[in-house]
Amino acid sequence: MLGGPSLRKRSAALINDDLLIDLGPDIMSASHMHGCSLDDVRYCLQTHPHADHLDLSHLLSRSPDYGVVGAPVLNVYASRETSERAAETFERDLAGYSLLSPEAEKRLSFKMHQIQPLKPFMVGPYSVMAFPANHAPGMGAMLYSIEANGRAIFYGTDTATLFEQTWQAFREHKMRFDAVILDHTYGPEQPGGDHLNAHQVIEHADRMRAEGVLGPHGRVFATHIAHEGNPAHPDLAAFAKEHGYEVAYDGLVLTT
């Protein structure tokens, strides 16, 4: 089946209109296609610096050179490794100055916050914790839990099998999620690697239910669906339904 939910852009998520997860290359086209304004975004949690998750030209377009005046500050949160790699790329390929410099903060109305894993921090009204992703060694890739107003989600891409320290943190902080979003790069017949496959998603969902990490009415969604062994959306959605999870698609909206 061509088009519809089988036609996918690169992964990102928007929470409550003001919190973006990943400054990816497709966020502007997705915003226009789905009628989802990004005008109110004040915060961004960056998972890692791979090009399908971070397009630094979005930041350059905030400068006065592009006619932008009086833009509200965009606060970006990332690991030290991710922020330093982003700064190096931005200076070398785009702007000639470091993304971590006072000049960048002033010209781009932007601030980079370096975060550490397994230590809670506040992002505006959101309580957030970062977890080391099993992905892209040396790049400080992170997964995130986000809680506000008594509701919590876990955003788990990109990653292979979750580290045991992540499960331990879930227990120590008594985390219980209303929604879990997991990497599903590989399909049912493909082995996992630096990402999860379908059967590993099932294993993670089952363990989350067994350990009480997923709330009694919690839902598990697959995202980051690649071409490697994943069928068209209707077939994959049917497979997922049989195994206790759901398949996300571009433009999906979750409400409480």
Where do the model's predicted regions map?
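Cap/insert and terminal regions of metallo-dependent hydrolase folds
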Residues: A160-L252
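Short, well-ordered amphipathic alpha-helices
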Residues: M28-H32, S57-P64, A86-A95, H199-R209
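Residue-level recognition of the N-termini of beta-strands and the immediately preceding loop/turn
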Residues: V41-R42, P72-N75, E105-F110, F177-D178, ...
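Active-site neighborhood of phospho(di)ester-bond hydrolases with catalytic His/Asp-centered motifs
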Residues: L20-G24, V41-D52, Y77-S79, F154-T159, ...
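Short, aromatic/basic amphipathic alpha-helical patches
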Residues: E88-P102, A232-G244
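Core dinuclear metal-dependent hydrolase active-site scaffold
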Residues: M1-C36, K111-Q168, L252-T256
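Alpha-helix termini
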Residues: G35-C36, R62-P72, D93-E103, E172-M175, ...
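Active-site metal-binding motif and surrounding structural segment of the metallo-beta-lactamase
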Residues: D18, G24-Y77, F177-V180
